[in-house]
């Protein structure tokens, strides 16, 4: 069927900010969809609130709106633009929920807008647990015994009938938010209450736990002619019970017999047909390992995290084709973009094994509960490709960016059998490593299978790795053993340690013996047809399929998995850099390992290598391609950390030299450079021992800011108020020694300013200066940023511009630099300089229209700023106000403290723009998920040092009609200031207390600041966590609170009696 001609304009709904459960995969799918629709001649309008994405670039769609994804704002855009149709299935759960809301509000009907791809009835049938169960019964497809519940009493009824354990699945939520497995009544109360709160329709499905079954996923496509295919099937190494986003996944499935494969394939196709989905869909199934009994777990009637993985695993671009199907094209009409010969109705075939391992944020949140269940906790993931599962798995392990090069962790070697058993049964992020350790210690596969029901096939693969370790250790210097180890994916790093040599020695030994990997192509058809895709993976085999051209090439290093501190912003910069390299006439080669991102879409670069970002894996590619050089500026700390080793191998680092990178990162060299340039910085010194640290802190005076050198996202950074806190930090947060010094600075409580600039060594161009709402001390990634600055005097702005230009030239920066300043007592100090792309590059690029990563790349390739039409100086400021607001995923991470500080905690960001600061802030806050009601109650519990500041805030809340609630101490201070307040009981009270008010939704805001100078009081922690669990905005910074007040005041009309007004005027006359 040809494409539809009765529609011209299509609105694509994006997925909003990155949160746990919804990461960069929707930037990839949304970008693909917009391009796909434009190819077909449609006018595309995009709405998304996330400025850090390629999707929100003006070139992606005909019109791009960066606005909050709420009914209020999306309706406004629909009424203004009058699209013929909307496509919500590429915007994740956010897009689907938005479509349902728009339909129910009547806006779509009012404006005559049709939903494309998946009909509203199909969305509701798949997402509403009750409707889905009914449909499965009609199809005769088995689902676990279950019950839809709307309150706790109904939950008790089901459990009494079926017994524990039961799984709670809330309706219309993302990444299993609010759900979990209940083994007893206490867990049932907690999880059901949470699930009902998080479900927008207050509905949960309770089902008998089938934990222990194999979890299998099918990624299926269907068109309007009822052609349906399986793009890829995947198997979770972790049995049912762990969310698929937190599971280690392999593709294609490894343990299914042909009969099982066909049985589940037929079921998946039957379900997509019954739902009438036109596009992509993900079906999750559970299979009993001892019989042919299976269950349908759930269906995602949209493009998902799994479809991004399936696209990258097979090379089959699901989102691109789903968009074409949505406008009426059929699979047998669409040419497969990979082979450019076959049609999209051919099911992909794989002649390799793909492994995906999630990347969790537990290195950031030491206190988080690491147990894995049905609620997702990973922020991102890595993927790797190999010719066997062992190779694929070990490549994925070293892609995780955790400093791990093998399936072993030193701290697990001490575990006894009982502890290992407990942790394997319970399942946490280290389970696979513990399985390997158990096998090393002689535990049998039978015992491990009994503990966690992991399939014997996977346990055998882990045992193969362990047996190979023994071989390697017993045969030092043996080339045959080395060859076998390399074929199994062992790293040079591991072999070097086993043979007591350096990694470089092993690398040289292999080269002398012609033991190097070849590169194979990902072609969707297992080499059955010739393919045109330049998409490769390494393996130890015979024939190399990556043909080196005679064009000059440049390698760009990607940023690896999405994690806190290094998000999709770096992928944005990477993609723009690749485009600039191509524009400059070079061949652009990218190395990355994140299946969710735009940079790993094979159509972006001239060549894509899907490989771990380690020195060994990167050097294999450089040895083959012999590029002009490597760009490390855009891949975050991942790429910067490889620069020194690459240079040791004789590789040219393009842009800022290694020496100058080091000068910005090394404390003493940086201090010397600032002194020479006459630029002030907070007093600080470097410590290499605990004793030194104590002495420095005494000399500088508390409070001090302590952090390790070479970090991203403020990892292990803290503000310390006294000596015992410093000792606690030195013991628990860092391992200090000569190679890993700790930086200790005077902590200045001032206004923080952030600047991004581009330097060519002679000229320094500054696209924008941003002001942070939160004072210095809150990580820049967690602060609300405002552009242009609202409270900087011209004199201070001039100082900042002068310092930026001096730093760009003085540090010999070629490319991008990011500087953080603090304004303290009307003086500008430099806190730090990052000689690379920062997380504000996409935000500023979009606002100012300066494509920063593109310009910087051309500078790196030798085209100076003047040639590109830019000179030295500050870009004229925009008239509108733009706000970048952080977005957190605290609801997914139990027992993590939500207090903001110097260590980054946000997972994503949104943008608000309007004519005034108040309006822009309102949009930014609403887009980030904070509800801003114009009246209600606010709970105030603050530390003594904040009481004075809190009084002014409380007074302003009172004046706009808010009801104030406070515990005795704060209430007394308020009463003394004649501010009406209601006293509430502290949380340790048996009577109705502060936590009850939060639980019952009787407070709209909670203001809670930390008591400094002692370990965080558990009371404060419980108040903050209770707020998160119950969806109440908890403000831990008084600066953020003031920003919200500005918005509330701008939305509220004043109401004063005439007498008050005349009294005020009389007072003014008397004192005039």
Curated annotation (Swiss-Prot):
Residues the entry annotates as binding Mg(2+) 1: 284, 298
Catalytic reactions on record: hydrogencarbonate + L-glutamine + 2 ATP + H2O = carbamoyl phosphate + L-glutamate + 2 ADP + phosphate + 2 H(+)
Domain notes for this protein: The large subunit is composed of 2 ATP-grasp domains that are involved in binding the 2 ATP molecules needed for carbamoyl phosphate synthesis. The N-terminal ATP-grasp domain (referred to as the carboxyphosphate synthetic component) catalyzes the ATP-dependent phosphorylation of hydrogencarbonate to carboxyphosphate and the subsequent nucleophilic attack by ammonia to form a carbamate intermediate.
Positions bound to Mn(2+) 1: 284, 298
Xref: SUPFAM superfamilies: Carbamoyl phosphate synthetase, large subunit connection domain (SSF48108), Glutathione synthetase ATP-binding domain-like (SSF56059), Methylglyoxal synthase-like (SSF52335), PreATP-grasp domain (SSF52440)
List of residues binding Mg(2+) 3: 820, 832
GO biological process: 'de novo' UMP biosynthetic process; glutamine metabolic process; L-arginine biosynthetic process
Major enzyme class: ligase
UniProt domain MGS-like: residue ranges: 930-1072
ATP-grasp domain location: 133-327, 671-861
Subunit structure and binding partners: Composed of two chains; the small (or glutamine) chain promotes the hydrolysis of glutamine to ammonia, which is used by the large (or ammonia) chain to synthesize carbamoyl phosphate. Tetramer of heterodimers (alpha,beta)4.
Sequence positions that bind Mg(2+) 4: 832, 834
Pathway where this protein functions: Amino-acid biosynthesis; L-arginine biosynthesis; carbamoyl phosphate from bicarbonate: step 1/1; Pyrimidine metabolism; UMP biosynthesis via de novo pathway; (S)-dihydroorotate from bicarbonate: step 1/3
Source organism of this protein record: Bacillus cereus (strain AH820)
Annotated stretches, region: Oligomerization domain: 402-546
Binding site for Mn(2+) 2: 298, 300
CDD domains registered for this protein in UniProt: MGS_CPS_II
GO molecular function, one term: metal ion binding
Reported cofactor(s): Mg(2+); Mn(2+)
Protein name: Carbamoyl phosphate synthase large chain
Assigned EC number: 6.3.4.16, 6.3.5.5
Keyword terms of this UniProt record: Amino-acid biosynthesis, Arginine biosynthesis, ATP-binding, Ligase, Magnesium, Manganese, Metal-binding, Nucleotide-binding, Pyrimidine biosynthesis, Repeat
Family the UniProt entry places it in: Belongs to the CarB family.
Residues annotated for ATP 2 binding in this entry: 707, 746, 752, 777-780, 820, 832
Region Carbamoyl phosphate synthetic domain, residue ranges: 547-929
Domain of life assignment: Bacteria
């Amino acid at each position: 069927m040809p494409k539809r001609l009765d529609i011209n304009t299509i609105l694509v709904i994006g997925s909003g900010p990155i949160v746990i459960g919804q990461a960069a995969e929707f930037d990839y799918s949304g970008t693909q969809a917009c391009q796909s629709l434009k190819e077909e001649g449609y006018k595309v309008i995009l709405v998304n609130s996330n400025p850090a994405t390629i999707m929100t670039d003006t070139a992606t769609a005909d019109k791009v709106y960066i606005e909050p994804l709420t009914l209020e704002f999306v309706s406004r855009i629909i009424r203004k633009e009058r699209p013929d149709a909307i496509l919500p299935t590429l915007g994740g759960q956010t897009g689907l929920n938005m479509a349902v809301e728009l339909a129910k509000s009547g806006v779509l009907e009012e404006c005559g807008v049709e939903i494309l791809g998946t009909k509203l009835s199909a969305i509701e049938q798949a997402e509403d647990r009750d409707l889905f169960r009914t449909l499965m019964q009609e199809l005769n497809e088995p689902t676990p015994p279950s019950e839809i519940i709307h309150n706790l009493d109904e939950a008790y009824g089901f459990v009494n009938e079926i017994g524990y354990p039961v799984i709670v699945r809330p309706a219309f939520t993302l990444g299993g938010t609010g759900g979990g497995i209940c083994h007893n009544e206490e867990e049932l109360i907690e999880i059901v209450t949470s699930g009902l709160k998080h479900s927008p329709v207050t509905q949960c499905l309770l089902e008998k736990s089938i934990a222990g079954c194999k979890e299998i996923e099918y990624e299926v496509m269907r068109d309007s002619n009822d052609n349906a295919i399986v793009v890829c099937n995947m198997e979770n190494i972790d049995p049912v019970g762990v969310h698929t986003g937190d599971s280690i996944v392999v593709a294609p499935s490894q343990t299914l017999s042909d009969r099982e494969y066909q049985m589940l394939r037929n079921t998946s196709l039957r379900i997509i047909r019954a739902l009438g989905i036109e596009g992509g869909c993900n079906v999750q199934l559970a299979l009993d390992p001892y019989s042919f009994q299976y269950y349908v777990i759930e269906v995602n009637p949209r493009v998902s995290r799994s479809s991004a993985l399936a696209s990258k695993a097979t090379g089959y671009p699901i989102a691109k084709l789903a968009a074409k199907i949505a406008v009426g094209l059929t699979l047998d009409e669409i040419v497969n973009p990979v082979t450019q010969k076959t049609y999209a109705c051919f099911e992909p075939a794989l002649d390799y094994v793909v492994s995906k391992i999630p990347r969790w944020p537990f290195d950031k949140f030491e206190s988080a509960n690491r147990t894995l269940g049905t609620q997702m906790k990973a922020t991102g993931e890595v993927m790797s490709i190999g010719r066997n599962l062992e190779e694929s798995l070990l490549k994925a392990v070293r892609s995780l960016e955790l400093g791990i090069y093998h399936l072993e962790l030193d701290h697990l070697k001490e575990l006894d059998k009982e502890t290992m058993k407990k942790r394997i049964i319970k399942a946490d992020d280290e389970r696979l490593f513990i399985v390997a350790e158990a096998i090393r210690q002689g535990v049998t596969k039978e015992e491990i299978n009994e503990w966690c029901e992991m399939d014997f096939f996977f346990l055998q693969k882990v045992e193969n790795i362990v047996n190979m370790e023994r071989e390697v250790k017993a045969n030092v210097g043996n080339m045959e053993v080395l060859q076998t180890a390399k074929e199994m994916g062992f790293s040079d790093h591991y072999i070097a340690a086993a043979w007591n040599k350096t990694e470089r020695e092993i690398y040289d030994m292999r080269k002398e013996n012609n033991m190097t990997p070849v590169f194979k192509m990902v072609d969707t058809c297992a080499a059955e047809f010739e393919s045109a895709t330049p998409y490769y993976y390494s393996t130890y085999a015979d024939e190399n399929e990556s043909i080196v051209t005679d064009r000059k090439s440049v390698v760009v290093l990607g940023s690896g998995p999405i994690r806190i501190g290094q998000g999709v912003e770096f992928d944005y910069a990477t993609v723009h850099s690749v485009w600039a390299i191509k524009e400059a006439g070079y061949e652009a080669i990218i190395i990355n390992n994140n299946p969710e991102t735009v940079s790993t879409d094979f159509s972006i670069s001239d060549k894509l290598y899907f490989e771990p970002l380690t020195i060994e894996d990167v050097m294999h590619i450089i040895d083959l391609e012999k590029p002009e050089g490597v760009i490390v500026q855009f891949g975050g700390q991942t790429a910067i950390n490889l620069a020194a080793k690459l240079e040791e191998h004789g590789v040219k680092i393009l842009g800022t030299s290694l020496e100058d990178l080091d000068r910005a990162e090394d404390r003493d060299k940086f201090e010397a450079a600032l002194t020479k340039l006459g630029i002030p910085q907070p007093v600080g010194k470097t410590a290499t021992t605990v004793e030194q640290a104590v002495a420095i802190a005494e000399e500088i005076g508390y409070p001090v800011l302590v952090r390790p050198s070479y970090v991203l996202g403020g990892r292990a950074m803290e503000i310390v108020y006294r000596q015992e806190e410093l000792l606690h930090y030195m013991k628990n947060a860092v391992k200090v020694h000569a190679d890993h010094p700790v930086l200790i600075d005077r902590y200045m409580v001032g206004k923080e300013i952030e600047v991004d600039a581009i330097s060519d060594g002679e000229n320094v161009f500054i696209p924008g200066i941003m002001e942070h709402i939160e004072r210095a001390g809150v990580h820049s990634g967690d602060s609300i940023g405002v552009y242009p600055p609202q409270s900087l005097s011209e004199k201070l702005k001039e100082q900042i511009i002068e310092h930026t230009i001096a730093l760009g030239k003085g540090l010999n920066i070629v490319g991008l630099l990011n500087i953080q300043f603090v304004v303290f007592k009307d003086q500008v100090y430099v806190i730090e300089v990052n000689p690379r792309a920062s997380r504000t590059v996409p935000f500023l690029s979009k606002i100012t229209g300066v494509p920063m990563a593109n310009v910087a790349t051309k500078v790196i390739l030798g085209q100076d700023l003047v040639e590109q039409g830019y000179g030295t100086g500050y870009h004229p400021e925009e008239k509108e106000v733009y706000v970048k607001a952080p977005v957190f995923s605290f609801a997914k991470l139990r027992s993590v403290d939500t207090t903001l500080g110097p260590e980054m905690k946000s997972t994503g960001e949104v943008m608000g723009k309007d004519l005034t600061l108040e309006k822009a802030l309102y949009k930014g806050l609403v887009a980030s998920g904070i509800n801003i009601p114009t009246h209600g109650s606010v709970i105030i519990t603050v530390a003594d040092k904040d009481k004075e500041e809190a009084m002014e805030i409380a007074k302003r809340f009172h004046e706009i009609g808010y009801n104030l609630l406070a515990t005795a101490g704060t209430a007394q201070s308020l009463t003394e200031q004649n501010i009406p307040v209601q006293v509430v009981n502290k949380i340790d009270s048996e009577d109705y207390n502060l936590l009850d008010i939060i639980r019952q939704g009787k407070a709209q805001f909670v203001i809670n600041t930390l008591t400094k100078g002692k370990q965080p009081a558990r009371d404060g922690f419980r108040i903050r966590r209770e707020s998160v669990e119950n969806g109440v905005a908890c403000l831990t910074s008084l600066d953020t609170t003031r920003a919200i007040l500005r918005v509330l005041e701008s939305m509220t009309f004043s109401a004063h009696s005439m007498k008050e007004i005349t009294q005020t005027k009389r007072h003014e006359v008397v004192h005039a």
